[in-house]
Amino acid sequence: MKNILKVFNTTILALIIIIATFSNSANAADSGTLNYEVYKYNTNDTSIANDYFNKPAKYIKKNGKLYVQITVNHSHWITGMSIEGHKENIISKNTAKDERTSEFEVSKLNGKIDGKIDVYIDEKVNGKPFKYDHHYNITYKFNGPTDVAGANAPGKDDKNSASGSDKGSDGTTTGQSESNSSNKDKVENPQTNAGTPAYIYAIPVASLALLIAITLFVRKKSKGNVE
């Protein structure tokens, strides 16, 4: 009887370790970092805004949806951001470094994704007065994994991007649109491959079945010993 209980306890411990290991593996596969660049809208040319985005970004999959967490420097210059029509969800700020980290829902982690950015500057830059107020489209080029996908759909952004140039306080041009884009953003189709492997869900079921079988076996042996 003692040997049976020892085997039973060992089996239970092994099952717990196996389930914990595979759960951690599943979570690890659905989060990580990705490198990216910021392009002028609908081009392969690096945007002047690229330097204000810290790399790499972080990605995470929650409830079947994909999210990226992006950190910007010169945070007080960047008054608003959106990706695929999804407005930023600010998750942390560092006032001392003038940085903030924002989370966006996205349709994929690899390839081009369109976004919008609002910039307002009214201060001295390089010792000279500078005023800039502009809203324009940009394109993110994500270099993340292709095997992590979500059921995300592009959101709706009711803000139309501005075009043309802005005027400074002295009447001179201080900024220009990244691109003469149309009012409608182009969004590539989301990935359709599966996210979490099926075996991740099968392991707990198989473990439970094995546990039930062992329990019935121990009970049967116990009754036999009593009789």
Curated annotation (Swiss-Prot):
<dbReference type="GO" id="GO:0046872">
    <property type="term" value="F:metal ion binding"/>
</dbReference>
<feature type="binding site">
    <location>
        <position position="136"/>
    </location>
    <ligand>
        <name>heme</name>
    </ligand>
</feature>
<keyword id="KW-0479">Metal-binding</keyword>
<dbReference type="GO" id="GO:0009274">
    <property type="term" value="C:peptidoglycan-based cell wall"/>
</dbReference>
<feature type="modified residue" description="Pentaglycyl murein peptidoglycan amidated threonine">
    <location>
        <position position="192"/>
    </location>
</feature>
<comment type="function">
    <text>Involved in heme (porphyrin) scavenging. Binds hemoglobin and almost exclusively free-base protoporphyrin IX. Probably has a role as the central conduit of the isd heme uptake system, i.e. mediates the transfer of the iron-containing nutrient from IsdABH to the membrane translocation system IsdDEF. Hemin-free IsdC (apo-IsdC) acquires hemin from hemin-containing IsdA (holo-IsdA) probably through the activated holo-IsdA-apo-IsdC complex and due to the higher affinity of apo-IsdC for the cofactor. The reaction is reversible.</text>
</comment>
<feature type="propeptide" description="Removed by sortase B">
    <location>
        <begin position="193"/>
        <end position="227"/>
    </location>
</feature>
<feature type="compositionally biased region" description="Low complexity">
    <location>
        <begin position="161"/>
        <end position="175"/>
    </location>
</feature>
<dbReference type="InterPro" id="IPR050436">
    <property type="entry name" value="IsdA"/>
</dbReference>
<dbReference type="InterPro" id="IPR017505">
    <property type="entry name" value="Sortase_SrtB_sig_NPQTN"/>
</dbReference>
<dbReference type="InterPro" id="IPR006635">
    <property type="entry name" value="NEAT_dom"/>
</dbReference>
<keyword id="KW-0408">Iron</keyword>
<dbReference type="InterPro" id="IPR019909">
    <property type="entry name" value="Haem_uptake_protein_IsdC"/>
</dbReference>
<feature type="short sequence motif" description="NPQTN sorting signal">
    <location>
        <begin position="189"/>
        <end position="193"/>
    </location>
</feature>
<feature type="binding site">
    <location>
        <position position="48"/>
    </location>
    <ligand>
        <name>heme</name>
    </ligand>
</feature>
<keyword id="KW-0349">Heme</keyword>
<dbReference type="InterPro" id="IPR037250">
    <property type="entry name" value="NEAT_dom_sf"/>
</dbReference>
<feature type="domain" description="NEAT">
    <location>
        <begin position="29"/>
        <end position="150"/>
    </location>
</feature>
<comment type="subunit">
    <text>Monomer. Interacts with IsdA.</text>
</comment>
<feature type="binding site">
    <location>
        <position position="47"/>
    </location>
    <ligand>
        <name>heme</name>
    </ligand>
</feature>
<dbReference type="GO" id="GO:0030492">
    <property type="term" value="F:hemoglobin binding"/>
</dbReference>
<feature type="signal peptide">
    <location>
        <begin position="1"/>
        <end position="28"/>
    </location>
</feature>
<comment type="similarity">
    <text>Belongs to the IsdC family.</text>
</comment>
<dbReference type="Pfam" id="PF05031">
    <property type="entry name" value="NEAT"/>
</dbReference>
<keyword id="KW-0134">Cell wall</keyword>
<feature type="region of interest" description="Disordered">
    <location>
        <begin position="149"/>
        <end position="191"/>
    </location>
</feature>
<keyword id="KW-0732">Signal</keyword>
<keyword id="KW-0572">Peptidoglycan-anchor</keyword>
<feature type="binding site" description="axial binding residue">
    <location>
        <position position="132"/>
    </location>
    <ligand>
        <name>heme</name>
    </ligand>
</feature>
<dbReference type="GO" id="GO:0015886">
    <property type="term" value="P:heme transport"/>
</dbReference>
<keyword id="KW-0964">Secreted</keyword>
<dbReference type="GO" id="GO:0005576">
    <property type="term" value="C:extracellular region"/>
</dbReference>
<protein>
    <recommendedName>
        <fullName>Iron-regulated surface determinant protein C</fullName>
    </recommendedName>
</protein>
